[in-house]
Amino acid sequence: MKTVIKIIKKDGTLEDYQDQKIINACNLAAQRALVTLNEHDYSTICRRVFEEINEVDYFDEQHQVEAVPVQDMHSIVERVLIELYPTVGEQYIQYRNYKINFVKMLDEVYRKEQEQRYIGDVSNANTDSTMVSTQRSLSYGTLSKELYKNFFLTKDELQATNDGYIYIHDMKDRRDCINCCLFDMSKVLQGGFEMGNVWYNEPKTLDTAFDVIGDITFGASAQQYGGFTIPRVDTILAPYAEKSYKKYVEEYLAVTRSYAGFYKDVAAREYAMEKVRRDFEQGFQGWEYKFNTVGSSRGDYPFIAISFGVGTSTWETMASEMALKVRMAGQGKDGFKKPVLFPKLTFLYDENLHGAGKELEWLFDTALECSSKCMYPDFLSLTGEGYIPSMYKKYGKVISLMGCRASLSPWYERGGMHPADEDDVPVFEGRFNLGAISLHLPMILAKARHESKDFYEVLDYYLEMIRGLHKRTYAFLGEKKASTNPLGFTQGGFLGGTLNPDDKIKSILPPMTMSFGITALNELQQLYNCKSLVEDGEFALEVMQYINEYVNRIKEEDKILYAIYGTPAESLCGLQVEQFRKKYGIIENVSDRAYVSNSFHCHVSEDITTIQKQDLEKRFWDLFNGGKIQYCKYPISYNKDAIKTLVRRAMQLGFYEGINLSLSYCEECGYEQLDMDVCPKCGSTHVTKIERMNGYLGYSRVHGKSRYNKAKMAEFKERKSM
């Protein structure tokens, strides 16, 4: 048995053999693999390594001592780990080569950074890559994404991502923060809160409430990467409207104290009412300017959304009405006004409030008028068929949508995933999503056929891969401290978010969701039997039912709220085509276009009616309860009755319904109409166009340029029913 062993380092110098160095290296690999090794494990590893050293003659004539080259030492440790702890061994091998990988990675980061800086970036329609702040953010994002790919993913996960079988959304952000949320604004405001080491008192007036909510929104949304939704904003603002009303009444009475009588009180109330209405108008105008012109510290324009419509008090209905009227009025110079993009508006539809002849039908009519001019609000059914209406009808709970479409699974106050008893109720506000990973189903089917394997066997492999990624991400984020998002985790913006700054957030993660995304069901059906979702759709339905059964099972096993999400593929719609072609070539109606279809939607080029599209997509509606939207193209903005009939039909079906128009505005003369590239009034080609990207709006053309990628622009040209 050898007793004195030296290690020959890369520079040729000698170093004493030390068990502790082996332990340190193995510990790093174990941490990356999310495996815990104990003292017995380390003792076993060191003993086996020493035994392997003793099997080889390492006597060094020059130094007259047993000396093991460091390269051999690494190989021995690799073999031992692969035999005893394969997962740790894989991570050890990857980490060992990190210097080589790091040089390659930095070279790739530099190349992409130069491309973004001098050519531009259109991967996200909410960013303007011409701005310095955005370029800095993109540079950081490129580095962060490469670090994630090289040091968080396993070899198989990286291969699947590079090939395109799965798509990990927001890789640059996933290790840092959360995705989208329903922010509990009321909880933060009540009693005051701390932000940036400064104490904010609770607002005493409506105009102050608008300002403070704007500050909170910018502060909190910058600490996440997904959509930031303020749910039921009409209810949030109502108490502050009441405070302002009382203040204005007292103000009027103080000025007119020398007068007396009934008419003075009436005049005071009328004065106060008009002042509150003006505060609502200016408040929503302020939000529109702020949310569309001031970039966040992330370098983008935050995806802000608000929902409203079911509040019935004077102040709640006034809030809803003014949000709509301000959007319709537009922003800009006189004669050149056009609607803004943010906040996204969602109208909460209750048949018992907004139905024909009901108390708030007038508010629904106002929302329809607004949508026919601005494409917002989208309409969310609370009383139709399906999951979201069922929660509202049974518990009176509104599930507002996070960002453009994501919805939360139920989480009960006492029982968690399942109600503790008949009196237990679900809670939705204050919860968030921890990230989405999408399956590329056409590629998975093509792989199964290419390798003569059962489709569901291959699908299971990638489902399990996503499951593993979600579990690791869940554990990783749980170690984050509450100080990473103070407004959410310490000031009550999130459910359970009253932690101390140094507390880990793992205790409040159980109510949060993680998503399995789905794209290109139409192309999956085409690859299966050369038929579209309009012509068939049975195989696509079968696959989605299978995935739902799988997700429901592992949700119980892992105690994680997994959800199935209809992916809004932006740049992904083109990337997936490129990935498919690289592996399996160009196949008619599968990969012959520049883009794939979104989620379960019929192909945009289908020449079908609005009713046909609604019925065809209804088949999939209950299989995507983690996020979905249904929209149709309405080239008839002037026909309000037709739009009302079709939206009402969508509400009966339980849809989240969007009205699609192609809004166009001439920058030279201010003329506006649907879908124009050249102004028919003055002949100018300086036209601003607003189109629906997926579940949200963006500029397809502004100042002669687009923030959309080429694949999405190709899709726009073929839109008929979308």
Q: What spans do the regions from the language model cover?
A:
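Catalytic-loop motifs flanking and including active-site residues across diverse enzymes
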Residues: 18, 22, 514-521, 686
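Long insertion/accessory domains within large nucleic-acid-processing enzymes
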Residues: 680-722
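Metallocofactor- and cofactor-centric catalytic cores in central/energy metabolism, strongly enriched
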Residues: 288, 527, 708-712
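Charged, amphipathic alpha-helical regulatory modules used
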Residues: 1-114, 702-705, 712-722
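Contiguous, well-ordered alpha-helical segments that form the cores/surfaces of helical PPI scaffolds
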Residues: 235, 514-527, 545
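A structural signal for well-ordered alpha-helices, especially hydrophobic packing surfaces
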Residues: 81, 85, 103, 470, ...
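Conserved catalytic cores of very large enzyme subunits
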Residues: 102, 109-510, 531-533, 537-692, ...
